A protein has these predicted regions:
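A composition/biophysics-driven feature that prefers long, compositionally simple stretches
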Residues: 1-149
């Protein structure tokens, strides 16, 4: 996990009085974890919480996700992934959800009443990603240098 980036997300969540967020966009998960997972139709969710008990909900078909430095909840195609995720969500508090989560997952979570309300949390991750950290600046400069050579 890129802990500094996660901390920035948590800070913006706190400013909006949000204690939990579900991130499903593979590019946002890559940004926060450093591991690219393309789940296809399967559930992939990074659950961030102000308590620090972050969880990555990921299918067993992606064992390389084990390298990510956070707790994993392994799912398989025979499980009710949304039901498993709902067990971890604080049901009496709002849940921030990113803009790219398929409706079939969000509606399932709503049906399980796994949050007091649901809000669009995409602005939080988007704002953090707008400001590049030193590592990103270095990588962008190197990419530009290589592009200039081509």
């Amino acid at each position: 996990m890129h802990q500094e980036r996660v901390n920035k997300v948590l800070d913006l969540m706190a400013q909006k009085n949000l204690t939990q967020m579900i991130i499903s966009d593979p590019s946002a998960i890559f940004y926060l974890t450093g591991t690219w997972i393309q789940p296809g139709e399967r559930l992939l969710a990074l659950y961030l919480t102000q308590t620090g008990k972050h969880k990555l909900f990921v299918n067993e078909l992606f064992p390389f996700a084990d390298a990510i430095q956070c707790d994993k909840v392994w799912l398989n195609d025979n499980m009710d992934g949304i039901g498993v995720l709902a067990e971890y969500v604080e049901k009496d508090k709002p849940v921030a959800i990113d803009k790219n989560w398929p409706a079939r997952f969000l509606i399932g979570l709503i049906d399980k009443k796994a949050g007091s309300t649901f809000v669009n949390g995409s602005e939080i991750v988007d704002r953090v990603r707008m400001v590049k950290d030193a590592e990103e600046i270095k990588l962008m400069r190197e990419a530009s240098r290589l592009n200039d050579l081509a």
